């Protein structure tokens, strides 16, 4: 029942010897979602122990090179490894032409299907769902069309208290009703409240990815209450004007979004190459949102399962 984020790259436009460009993998119960795929992603995937062939979904936030130049080598390697299962890619509409060019010129060895889902929404919209999880995309505020993502578990079926089964003499049909979250209404008008006889076994977990973006009013509401938020913090607070000019965020802006959204934890990255060390970012961030961590390449973050 793991829900584990592996951070592969934390650089912004210019990679450094310590930071690869943006790329992450979220493992949701063994189903792998890759988010952005900057240059060198294959090497980082190997270092992180992630199987290329187990990646089912790749989410591309926008068509800037530091977020996707690693994709084409990864697709080619998947072909060399004999991948046969389909790969789902979620990206802005302009990516279709890029993918078509790549496939026409370099795609001979790629025998698996690529399902491209074009992102063009103006508010959060579900773009994928399975029995246990769903993926939502929503617009960011960047220089070009850019999207953030939420990956979250679905609400599990209710469990029925064993004591309630014996006390009420529940039938299989009534147990099924309670597991769907509904009250039981018996002939004659007797009601068995769901809240009395059943319970949610655990709290669904959620993760939001917001990069690249400048702040905007709707964002906090869209990501409200997620367990873990990754938000770009390209610049320290003193470089506010540069952040405005480039449509990025400062440390304080990222922390303010986390605070306003009431998230569980804040994780920041996408650091400017101007700073060999960004340890000083943490002091700025924690003045606004104390439960903040700096992401580093190859860090792992687990969202634990909280049972009720």
Please annotate each region the language model reported.
Residues 1-48, 84-86, 149-151, 199-210, ...:
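Conserved beta-strand hairpin/beta-sheet module of binuclear metal-dependent hydrolase folds
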Residues 6, 90, 115-120, 136-138, ...:
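General small-molecule cofactor/ligand-binding pocket signal
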Residues 35-38, 55-63, 92, 207-213, ...:
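Active-site neighborhood of phospho(di)ester-bond hydrolases with catalytic His/Asp-centered motifs
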Residues 83-87, 92-120:
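Active-site neighborhood of divalent metal-dependent phosphoester bond hydrolases
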């Amino acid at each position: 029942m793991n829900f584990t984020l592996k951070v592969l790259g934390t650089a912004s436009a210019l990679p450094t010897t310590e930071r690869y460009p943006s790329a992450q993998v979220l493992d949701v119960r063994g189903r792998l979602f890759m988010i952005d795929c900057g240059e060198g992603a294959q090497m980082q995937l190997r270092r992180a122990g992630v199987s290329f062939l187990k990646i089912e979904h790749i989410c591309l936030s926008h068509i800037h090179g530091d977020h996707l130049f690693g994709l084409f080598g990864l697709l080619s390697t998947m072909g060399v490894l004999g991948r046969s299962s389909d790969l789902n890619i979620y990206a802005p509409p302009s990516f279709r032409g890029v993918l078509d060019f790549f496939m026409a010129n370099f795609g001979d060895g790629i025998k698996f299907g690529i399902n491209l889902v074009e992102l063009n929404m103006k508010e959060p919209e579900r773009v994928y769902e399975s029995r246990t999880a769903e993926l939502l995309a929503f617009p960011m505020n960047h220089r070009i069309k850019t999207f953030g993502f939420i990956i979250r578990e679905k609400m599990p079926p209710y469990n029925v208290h064993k004591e309630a089964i014996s006390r009420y003499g529940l039938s299989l049909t009534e147990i099924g009703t309670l597991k769907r979250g509904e009250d039981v209404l018996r002939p004659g008008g007797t009601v068995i409240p769901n809240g009395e006889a059943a319970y949610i076994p655990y709290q669904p977990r959620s993760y939001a990815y917001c990069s690249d973006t400048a702040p905007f009013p709707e964002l906090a509401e869209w990501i409200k209450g997620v367990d873990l938020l990754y938000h770009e913090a390209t610049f320290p607070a003193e470089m506010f004007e540069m952040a405005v000019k480039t449509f990025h965020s400062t440390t304080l802006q990222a922390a303010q979004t986390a605070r306003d959204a009431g998230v569980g934890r804040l994780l920041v990255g996408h650091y400017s190459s101007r700073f060999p060390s960004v340890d000083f970012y943490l002091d700025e961030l924690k003045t606004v949102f104390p439960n903040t961590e700096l992401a580093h390449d190859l860090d792992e973050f687990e969202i634990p399962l909280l049972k009720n």
